[in-house]
């Protein structure tokens, strides 16, 4: 997981090619402000819209859009898995040719990026297609066995609009594969981030605290303790980071001196912020206090990261500042409102778990019957 915010004075990884060994001219204050302002905006968009879509996703009945629920056990293991993955990538780049590794990774993320971008733009297609558009339904079905022993391996339903989205996303994919252009990189990065915030759901606030706390330690260790994360971030030519050129004003779209923000700094706080939005809705008070508080906390934390980075002239682990802000601000609000118990007792069931679904239905029916009994009395 790439989670470091790069230091423009120490050089950034280039999304369009290998790192330039020659000394680059210093970026102008205007260029730096534009770059980091754009990174901040790009980070906020998938968090805001991903959180809104996560609410519809939790209520939806489409099996292909069911969220993946992260439990406390998953959260505790995640920093260990992320560390092993990061160290493995670092060793691969040290042992094998960087060119061949990035070629394989490019093909892998080419496919993933097309699917993620297609899923991202699909909801907007209804606004662009006329009502008379022939939207035909399709089904991709793979089964194993026959008769009573037949099992579904793949059962995917889609329509003509989904095929149009796939075609448009493929154009971006080919552009990225051939040019590694920073705009194509960002389109894929934004799609990955939005899909992550939308489809990855924490089951409760305690799990969110475990996940963010573990990755807080992970981020600090791998950025300050070693050069592993920064090395991987600069070597890894894949859309796992948002980038923006600091020399855009001088070189236009061919600019190549990039500031970057890892997708982990967007998705990890983003899924916690999305959880707080769903908690707000569960309170049924027609306010989104905790969502807006955590959203403002994210802006504060990322802004502080950028400020500290320029003071110390060193790449910063953004989660060092984002985690205390995104957890601390909402908890302080909950303390002030006397809703700490409600916040930490809020629980989301896994929609893919039949037992949880049954339990949820039984709970709903019980609540409804109690409500009827009260009305009769």
Curated annotation (Swiss-Prot):
Q: Where are the transmembrane segments?
A: 32-52, 78-98, 101-121, 158-178, 182-202, 210-230, 257-277, 291-311, 315-335
Stretches assigned to coiled coil? none
Kindly list the GO CC terms recorded for this protein: cell surface; cytoplasmic side of endoplasmic reticulum membrane; Derlin-1 retrotranslocation complex; endoplasmic reticulum; endoplasmic reticulum membrane; lumenal side of endoplasmic reticulum membrane; membrane; plasma membrane
Q: Where is this motif: PAL?
A: 317-319
So which tissues is this one expressed in? Widely expressed with highest levels in kidney, liver, placenta, lung, leukocytes and small intestine and reduced expression in heart and skeletal muscle. Expressed abundantly in the CNS with highest levels in thalamus and medulla.
- Residues at the active site: 219, 265
Enzyme Commission numbers on file? 3.4.23.-
The reported result of mutating residue 219 to A is: Abolishes proteolysis of PSEN1
Biological process GO terms, please?
cellular response to oxidative stress; in utero embryonic development; membrane protein proteolysis; membrane protein proteolysis involved in retrograde protein transport, ER to cytosol; signal peptide processing
The subcellular localization recorded is: Endoplasmic reticulum membrane; Membrane
Topology feature Lumenal, residues: 1-31, 99-100, 179-181, 231-256, 312-314
Give the protein's biological function.
Answer: Catalyzes intramembrane proteolysis of signal peptides that have been removed from precursors of secretory and membrane proteins, resulting in the release of the fragment from the ER membrane into the cytoplasm. Required to generate lymphocyte cell surface (HLA-E) epitopes derived from MHC class I signal peptides. May be necessary for the removal of the signal peptide that remains attached to the hepatitis C virus core protein after the initial proteolytic processing of the polyprotein. Involved in the intramembrane cleavage of the integral membrane protein PSEN1.
Q: Cite the record's note on assembly.
A: Monomer. Homodimer. Interacts with RNF139. Interacts with DERL1 and XBP1 isoform 1.
Q: What is this protein called?
A: Signal peptide peptidase
- What is the organism of origin for this protein? Homo sapiens (Human)
Q: Which gene encodes it?
A: HM13
